[in-house]
Amino acid sequence: MALNLLSIPPSYHGLIIQRIPLKTGLVPAEPLKTLAPSKSKLNTIEAKRIMSVLDEAINKVELITLMSYLESHPEALEDALPENFVEAIREHLDIGQALVEKASILQRKQKELEKGEEAEEDWDQERLLSIELHKTNLWPLTHQFRDSTKTILRLLINEPQLTRLLHTQAPGRSPGAQCLLTSLVELRGFLFEKLLTSPMEVREKNQFIQDISRRSKRNQEIIDALQAELAEVLKNKEAEVEKENFVIQELKNHLHQVFKFSENSLLRTKQEAEKQQKVDYRASQARQAKTQQDILALRAQYHNLVMENREAEQALRKKKYKVETEIENWIQKYDMEMNEKQEEYEDLETIHKEEKLQLEELKERHAVLVEEFSQIRAESEINSKKRVEAEREMVRMVRAATLIQAMWKGYLVRSMLRSRKKKRVKSKGKDKGKGKEKPKEEKGKEKKAKGKGKGKK
């Protein structure tokens, strides 16, 4: 009774844990496919906060259920843990040990009190007072145990490395702790589905459930009717089976009578068969004597045939010997001819090999000559190309020389014509100067014009 009042975590059974494989993953409960919500994410802040609080609670429960490994094996991770964490674990272990001892004492006293109640009707006031005193002393220890658990949990949350180390080192959880985790994960899935479901979807879900219940009710009525029909059919079947059993019994009686009749007929048949066997034996004795006489006659005939065939066999043996000797002679002759042919073939093969070697040498020489011919041909082509190019260059040079000579001759002719023209202009100017005198400005302009004309020419 007193232990039921205490809120001790489910993973501590006398500080000993039954090791099972770790299952820390959050597996949401699978909803019905036909009733799945339309949304896949939470939209409201309140719903997100509710889910975050539940996820944090699941994470804390996972860490608390793994703390039993630290309590049962404090020396396993003592080197890897900081000093404040080790001190908190030791304090937690001391408080837990004291709590378990006092709880066991309280439980023992309650059992003694129950035994006393069965023996006597008067209650022992002193025992009741001691039990109440133990309960009052147990409550502070319970609160201290909770506070130390919260402290260790806070240290684990603040140190992710310690959490990972604990996950890797801890071998498992107790069945109760694993069941609690599984229930929390299922609760998370149910709550997540509940938060995703809108009022319209809830009404649709209720309508769907009502439809299913009505359908189930109709199916149950159909099943009841079918069961009643089945019972009626079974009754009729049993009646038919009884009739068939009666017919089978009558057939068995008839079969028994037939069996007795067949035994009598079999006995009569056996007696008749014995009589017939005696008659057949006598007839077979007579046939056997006749067959013996036939055998003797056939033996004499066989002896005569053997004597006749022996002479024919000797003649055939002689003929066979003669044929075998002829065959041996032919074989020897064939072997001699084959040996001669073999020698001739070997000679031809040696000649063929020599000619083959000569052919290889000739092929090599031919390849060398072909290569030399190709080189000579390439050189001749290059020389012919160079010759053609030189001829073309000579033609270009001749054309250029003739063009230069023609240009030079033209230049000389033009220069001669220009000098003659200047002389004519000067003579004309002298004649005009005698008649009229031009102003100085016009003379300057004429000089400039003449200078421009010379520049253009």
From Swiss-Prot:
Origin superkingdom: Eukaryota
Keyword Nucleotidyltransferase: no
Places the protein is found: Cytoplasm, Cytoskeleton, Flagellum axoneme
The IQ domain, residue ranges: 397-426
Composition bias, Basic residues: 446-457
Keyword Coiled coil: yes
Region (Disordered): 419-457
Alphabetized InterPro entries for the sequence: DRC10, IQ_motif_EF-hand-BS
CDD domains named among the record's database cross-references: IQCD
Keywords: Cell projection, Cilium, Coiled coil, Cytoplasm, Cytoskeleton, Flagellum
Coiled coil spans: 101-127, 209-258, 292-381
Extent of Basic and acidic residues compositional bias: 428-445
Entry GO terms, CC: ciliary basal body; cytoplasm; motile cilium
Quaternary context: Component of the nexin-dynein regulatory complex (N-DRC). Interacts with CFAP52.
Family: Belongs to the DRC10 family.
Role description: Component of the nexin-dynein regulatory complex (N-DRC), a key regulator of ciliary/flagellar motility which maintains the alignment and integrity of the distal axoneme and regulates microtubule sliding in motile axonemes.
PANTHER family: DYNEIN REGULATORY COMPLEX PROTEIN 10, IQ DOMAIN-CONTAINING PROTEIN D
Protein name: Dynein regulatory complex protein 10
Source organism (scientific name): Rattus norvegicus
